[in-house]
Amino acid sequence: MLPLLVVLMSVGSSEAENPLQMANVLPNASFEKRSQGGVEGWSSRSWNGDSDGIWTVAAAGRTGARSVSIASKKGLDAAWTATVRVKPKTFYELSGWIKTDKLQGAIGALVNIQNMPKVRTPSVTGTKDWTRVATLFQTGATTELEINCLFGGWGRSTGRAWYDDVVLVEVAGPREQAMTRATATVIIDVDSPSVEYNPMIFGGFIEHLGKQIYGGFFDPGSPLADEKGFRLDVIEAIKELKTHVIRWPGGCFVDSYHWQKGVGKDRQPYDDDRWGVVEPNTFGTHEFIELCRRVGAEPYICQNGLADTQEMADWVAYCNSTTGKFAEMRKMNGHPEPFDVKFWSVGNERSGRTYIHKVRDGAKAMRQVDPSILVTCSGSHGPQAHIDPYLLETAGKYLSLLSIHEYWVANYQRHQTPDYLSCMMLSEKPDAHIRGIVKAFDQANMQGQIKIAFDEWNLRSWHHPGFSGHNARKVDHKDPEIIALIKARDKSLQPSLYTMADALFCASFFNTCLRSAEDVEMANIACLVNQTGPLYAHPNGIVKRTHFHTMAMYANLLQKRVAKLELKAGSLRHGNQSVGVVDAIATVDETGEKWSIAMVNRHPSDAVACTTKMGETLLDGTYKATILSGHSPDAYNDIEHPDRVVPKEVELIFNNGIVELPPHSLLMIQLQDRS
């Protein structure tokens, strides 16, 4: 029988997705049709425990008007049960949505099959909002199934659980070879020249949106902040990431930002017409430079793409000049020495001929002030890796970098919570995206002359319903609808969103950048703090999300050069999509003696036997390694449990070249540290 592929996904009930629009085998799956004493097609039953069970048809459902629930104060095994006919030797997915209140003891709440006891979804316990659970299975010879919305385990579960939108659908089964255990082979080329990569791929991005800046790392008045308003705990955590470059102030925010209003003592709050909030304007150029200096990052400033080129040139003069009007202004504001900002962008996520001319003229104007700066502009944002040839033809000779943006789960208007496997199916998309950009450079005969700055990237975008960011919108800040839209942005802060899917997608993204080291100069995770970032700052402290640890491992444990390797791996499939089950990268120091290898096993539940060779030699022996994994692919860190997912140092045994890669894990292996 196929090993069960389990999926756990949590969302708020107001953002729940519709049930699968397929042929649902189950009757009355949303429990909308009542029958005498219950719901049509389902019956209540109990097994072990006290007889205090309460089966209820609840007046509110995840979707529709109803759901069903089970409750017990003393302990119970109980279910709502439906019996259905199915095809033999056929793959099905069983899923449902569960909400719980103080559910504890034994297993909890889940959906299972009574006459196929090994087929069961993950369980939900505690107090949780609507949570999707699912499992994939094959029926074998069975033609009839008893489906349980199950509560309990050994008669000891207490609390209450609600069930809704239970779905049993036939799905395409994996190919025959996927039925066998996945394997992989990594052959590291020890003879070909290695390539030095730019550590600026470990960069960050911050924007005046949500709680990234205010209420994030900059929070004057917080007991955790210093006299200048910087949260010291957040600053120390950012240092762990070895963040080499930080991009600011936007993002779409920059299209209404005028830098002179954010320097000096007389700073006035103003309406940010991009994000519909009042910008306090207390974090400006000087504060940004101080942030960068504190964490050891290069500052990267994105200019207002709607401003005139003189305003752009003046900002460069303010930051970098030693003499003149703007140098004197900077000195009057407390900084006699220039900031020496090296990286400047002309606008954010803009396109068209008017913009391209602005890029050309803005780059020329800025470089007249400081010829040493490196200029970038908006090249591609969104899933299509398309670069306007006119941009490269008109402004290419003034550019050192080209800004690329992509978020592979677009949460802008609709908050989505795809499951682990769906996220893994996206993990090879960055590689295809970068290849498309490089092809555009090649067609313009500019490969090697302009490098890629992937200066906004993340698996998930942040949530900002009602505001596109690209269009100005005047709002009434007292309007209840506007208040609700602004509040909805906090959905991006939910700890349960950031699972091993985020950690391993992040690893795959870095592997892509490392493989493309000759073309990718910079990458900035969006964002660095709060929203979808690796670091969650709350009023009482911080939580290092799963992808924080991925970033820290890559920034601290790799060597400085990328070696070639050949990777052969089986496929991990989900529906009609597939990716390699293993991803890997090898790095080496300048001497060729120290090696660090990163290996990712994307499989949610199975270990992978990986054969590793250094040239023609099978790797053998015990080596020190660092592993990042969790108790399940859906493991996450939160305020109550900040260390569910943390890196651990282990000793890894290679037996005749073969090493076991644990499921849903990242391994960083130090070959020089042989035990």
Write out the residue ranges for each language-model feature.
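Solvent-exposed beta-hairpin/edge-strand motifs
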Residues: 615-639
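Noncatalytic carbohydrate-binding groove/subsite architecture in carbohydrate-active enzymes
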Residues: 354-510, 568-578
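N-terminal catalytic cores of secreted or lumenal carbohydrate-active enzymes
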Residues: 175-418, 431, 435
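Substrate-binding cleft of secreted/luminal carbohydrate-active enzymes
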Residues: 502-532
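Extracellular and organelle-lumenal recognition/adhesion modules and their flexible linkers in secreted
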Residues: 15-187, 191, 262-280, 298, ...
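Bacterial N-terminal signal peptides
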Residues: 1-10
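Glycan-recognition and catalytic regions of carbohydrate-active enzymes
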Residues: 521-594
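Carbohydrate-binding surface patches
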Residues: 579-619, 625, 667
